[in-house]
């Protein structure tokens, strides 16, 4: 098993001048959809690049809706789920977006080296990274304080 967390498989073919597609994590999406978010400016600068190519998956989409609809999301409370869903739909439609199904497993030793996971807080990121690498992309996440 390699020393990295994820075994790199042959990526799908892409145009040589295209950057890898970025699977945006929940934190990046929240920053994109909420102008009051502390990282909104950085997230928007990332996707406004002419080369920006993004991806979502069910895990990320569900997480965005769940978190932004929580009553404790902001001082004003959560947003209506239908509004968050609509914003997500509009953003995906306006960007170079593709949808990646959640179809990798952390039980797959050919895809991940689970022995390198140091704690429970890395499990979701490991899964998203495995999905992105398997599909020839990268994982774009917001820095956590």
Predicted regions and their residues:
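Short, basic/glycine-rich phosphate-binding loops at helix/coil junctions
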Residues: 20, 24, 66-68, 106-109
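A general structural signal for well-ordered alpha-helical segments in protein cores
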Residues: 61, 84-88, 125
């Amino acid at each position: 098993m390699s020393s990295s967390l994820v075994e790199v498989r042959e990526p799908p073919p892409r145009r040589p001048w295209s950057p890898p597609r970025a699977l945006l994590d929940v934190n990046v999406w929240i920053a994109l959809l909420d102008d009051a978010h502390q990282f909104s400016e950085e997230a928007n600068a990332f996707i406004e690049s002419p080369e920006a190519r993004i991806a979502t998956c069910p895990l990320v989409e569900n997480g965005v809706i769940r978190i932004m609809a929580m009553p404790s999301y902001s001082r004003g409370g959560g947003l209506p789920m239908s509004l968050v869903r609509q914003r997500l739909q509009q953003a995906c439609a306006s960007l170079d977006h593709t949808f990646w199904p959640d179809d990798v497993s952390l039980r797959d030793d050919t895809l991940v080296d689970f022995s390198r996971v140091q704690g429970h807080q890395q499990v979701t990121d490991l899964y998203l990274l495995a999905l992105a690498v398997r599909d020839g992309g990268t994982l774009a996440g917001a820095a956590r304080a």
